[in-house]
Curated annotation (Swiss-Prot):
Cited function: Catalyzes the transfer of a phosphate group to glutamate to form L-glutamate 5-phosphate.
Catalytic activity from the UniProt record: L-glutamate + ATP = L-glutamyl 5-phosphate + ADP
Chief localisation class: cytoplasm
Keywords: Amino-acid biosynthesis, ATP-binding, Cytoplasm, Kinase, Nucleotide-binding, Proline biosynthesis, Transferase
EC number(s) from the headed UniProt entry: 2.7.2.11
Segments forming domain PUA: 285-359
Protein location: Cytoplasm
SUPFAM superfamilies per UniProt: Carbamate kinase-like (SSF53633), PUA domain-like (SSF88697)
Name of the protein: Glutamate 5-kinase
Species, as recorded: Bifidobacterium adolescentis (strain ATCC 15703 / DSM 20083 / NCTC 11814 / E194a)
Family annotation (PANTHER family): GLUTAMATE 5-KINASE (PTHR43654), ISOPENTENYL PHOSPHATE KINASE (PTHR43654:SF1)
Gene it is expressed from: proB
Pfam family, any one: AA_kinase
């Protein structure tokens, strides 16, 4: 695809039918661990304007922990996971109450969806998330999403909402992703560093990643810093979705396509949201080792992984889990959702479809990983 000009990217954002807006903790809360209703209301006003003009907006909002820790008597964001989970349980309610009241002033309803990684990699939950989001949007509501911090385990969690927002943009087939934070744009280095320069347009985020010096959070409530925002912009770009990054007070102009913040061009045509989800969100639970013929077929991009071409299975997983597909040298070729439990697979290895049917029955005469569930890495 040809690289679009900045004006084209800004126009695409202005014309977006479906927009995912992600807002960070520092844009909604006080450092003392309480909500800042004024800033939250200003954000809601900008989103409501787009919504009332007919746009479909999904809001991915951080801020549960940051809104809850002051209320629970902590003087700074706790580091203990159980404390954070308790703060999130309190703060999430406060956050939603505030959003509910703020959107109601414009006659708009909100719907809360809390997501954990483990919920969303299973095909059925993925479909449920997608269906609920689509229905909320069809009904004119504004879905508000956060990670389910009170339930997420420390080992498997998004941890930041930046990447989650890019995955949500895929799920709802968004036309634009708007990342709102406490800095007005991406800079060539963390803005605290002397000489860092504002970047208004990134035609290729993968090239930019090599050139820009990105750092962690600048506030005491944010988590991901610019690293995860760049990753979100990259996921959006490779998914064919233009993105803009700016401060929350620029939300309105950013969604109108005004030249604020940093615009990121898409670098691919749109992909299948399901495949992107597998590629970005899933955590492989095991490995299928492909022989050289199967490795070549998988690398070609259009083939399913058949039992006949698999020489080894590693790990303990259930049908529907994500697995790595490796070559015999141990290189990762692809990630996929496997169709069988790990203990069923050894008896299937090396057998073609006719043999699987004859020896094991009809239900085994299927690929280990169907090509629709396979994503090259
Ligand atoms: N190259 C960079 N350009 C802009 N900001 C950067 C850069 N590197 C690091 N940062 C920091 O990232 C911070 C935003 O991330 P974070 O604090 O996690 O915000 P949020 O709570 O909105 O997710 C900025 O305040 C800034 O200090
Ligand atoms: N899910 C957490 C926030 C995680 C997060 O991404 O925070 P931030 O870096 O402020 O966007 C919460 O609501 O407190």
């Amino acid at each position: 695809m040809n690289t679009p000009s900045q004006a084209q990217v800004r126009r695409a954002i202005a014309e977006a039918q479906t927009i995912v807006v992600k807002v960070g903790s520092s844009s909604l809360t006080e450092p003392s661990g309480h909500l800042d209703p004024q800033r939250l209301n200003a954000l809601v006003a900008a989103i409501a304007r787009v919504r009332l003009m007919g746009g479909r907006v999904v809001l991915v909002s951080s801020g549960a922990i940051a809104a809850g820790f002051g209320t629970l008597g902590f003087d700074k964001r706790p580091t203990d996971v159980a404390d954070q989970q308790a703060c999130a349980a309190v703060g999430q309610g406060l956050l939603m109450a505030q959003y509910e009241a703020a959107f109601a002033r414009y006659g708009l309803r909100v719907g809360q969806i809390l997501i954990t990684v483990s919920d969303t990699i299973a095909p059925q939950q993925y479909r449920n998330v997608r269906r609920t989001l689509d229905r909320l949007l069809d009904l004119g509501a504004v879905p508000i999403i956060n990670e389910n911090d009170s339930l997420a385990s420390n080992e498997i969690r998004f941890g930041d909402n930046d990447r989650l927002s890019a995955l949500i943009a895929n799920i709802v087939v968004a036309d634009a992703l708007v990342l709102l934070t406490d800095v007005d744009a991406l800079y060539t280095a963390p803005p605290s560093e002397p000489g860092s320069k504002r970047i208004s347009y990134v035609p290729n985020v993968e090239d930019a990643l090599a050139k820009v010096q990105v750092g962690g959070t600048g506030s005491n409530v944010g988590t991901g810093g610019m690293v995860t925002k760049m990753e979100a912009a990259r996921v959006a770009a490779v998914s064919g979705i233009p993105a803009v990054l700016t401060c929350a007070s620029n939300a309105g102009p950013a969604m109108m396509g005004d030249p604020v913040g940093t615009a990121f061009a898409p670098i691919n045509d749109r992909g299948s949201s399901r495949r992107l989800w597998i590629g970005f969100a899933s955590h492989p639970q095991g490995t299928l080792v492909a022989d050289s013929g199967a490795a070549k077929a998988v690398r070609g991009g259009a083939a399913s992984l058949l039992a006949a071409g698999v020489v080894e299975v590693k790990g303990d997983f259930a049908a529907g889990d994500a697995v790595w597909v490796d070559d015999e040298q141990g290189n990762h070729l692809a990630k996929g959702l496997v169709g069988f439990d790990s203990e069923e697979i050894p008896q299937m290895l090396g057998r073609n479809t006719a043999q699987l049917k004859r020896f094991l029955g009809e239900e085994y005469a299927h690929p280990l990983v169907h090509r629709d569930n396979l994503v090259l890495v």
